[in-house]
Each structure stands twice: as C-alpha cells, then as structure tokens.
Design a protein with these regions (language model features):
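Intrinsically disordered, low-complexity protein-interaction/activation regions
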Residues: 1-183
C-alpha cells in the first residue's frame, strides 16, 4: 500500500469530510464567477425549427455557457422572469392565451419562426406546465450557478403574486433587443 492509501485508511469520516469541504471551497473560490445572464438570438440561417433563443451565463473569465433547460416551458418561464423580475401572477387559467397574452406572445417569439402561429393547449395543461417549469428552472439554474448565490429559492406569495426573482444581486441581465418589446 502506498503512503497516500495508508493515510486515507487511517482518517476518520469526520477528517475526510473536513478535507473534502476544504477542497470544494477552494475549487469554488477559483471557479469562474457569473457576471451576466444573456438571452441571445441564435445566429442561424434557417429559423423554421424550434428554440430560436439561448439563455447564456457569461463568466468573469470571458467564457460562456448555455443553460440547458429540461423543456421549453422552463426556458419560457426563466426568460419571462428575466423580463419581469417580480415574477408572474397565477390567475384563473380558463383561457390561458387571454389570461397570459404576454406569455403566449413570448413563447411564439422564442420558439416559433412565425409569430402569428397558434399554440394548442388546454388551460389545465398550461397551468400544470407552468408549475412544473418553475421547478425545472430552479434545477437548471442550480446546476449552472449554484442555489446559494441565487435568490430564486421557492416561489413566495407577495400581495397575491408568485414572486420568483430571476438572478442574485449584481448579476447583469442582457436581453436580445427583439424580445425587449415583451417587457
């Protein structure tokens, strides 16, 4: 057995946990820090497909990373919270496109080349997807940046609104100019 293996064998669980915490803290200290979230139009010739916009984390070492969302509703909700940092209000969703016209419009702008194209869904499906999307957003952002630095937390009720802060304090938000009309 090597000296390193012997030293590991002699360590208690507490010592191992302490060393691991120390190494993880050092890694975190040296890791590039996010400085901005950007919603960027893809530079593509054919936009007849889906997923026309990317959500990108820009870091202080001049690198960038695309956030991978589990589904399109998660991306929609996250971009919506960037455009509306106070979150969205859950209303009676008898007719989602009428109750949430800005969400339907933003959905078409992000995912469809034809902004007039209709979205087929029922009110129940829409409500369910929006609820699940909030959870998926938290998971994607946690994986990318880490929850302890975010204020996204659990949705909180504030004067009847479900408030989902977009990003932690000090992070710049850059939105593609074509989506600015959705603010």
């Amino acid at each position: 057995m090597s000296k390193i293996q012997e030293a590991i064998q002699q360590m208690s669980v507490e010592e191992m946990q302490e060393r691991l915490a120390k190494y993880m803290a050092t890694d975190k200290e040296w890791a590039p820090k996010p400085v901005a979230i950007e919603v960027r139009h893809r530079d593509i010739k054919d936009i007849s497909g889906t997923n026309i916009y990317d959500v990108i984390v820009l870091k202080d070492d001049d690198t960038e990373e695309v956030i991978k969302f589990e589904d399109r509703y998660s991306k929609l909700i996250y971009i919506y919270t960037l455009l509306h940092p106070k979150g969205y209000q859950r209303r009676s969703l008898n007719k989602p496109e009428k109750a949430f016209p800005e969400l339907a419009s933003l959905y078409r702008a992000i995912f469809m080349a034809d902004p007039e194209r209709l979205i087929a869904y029922t009110a129940k499906d829409f409500d369910h997807m929006m609820s699940m999307a909030v959870s998926f957003v938290r998971k994607a952002i946690d994986k990318m940046i880490g929850c302890e630095e975010l204020t996204i937390g659990n949705p909180r009720q504030y004067y009847g609104r479900t408030v989902i802060p977009a990003v932690y304090n000090g992070l710049e938000i850059i939105i593609d100019s074509q989506l600015q009309s959705h603010i």
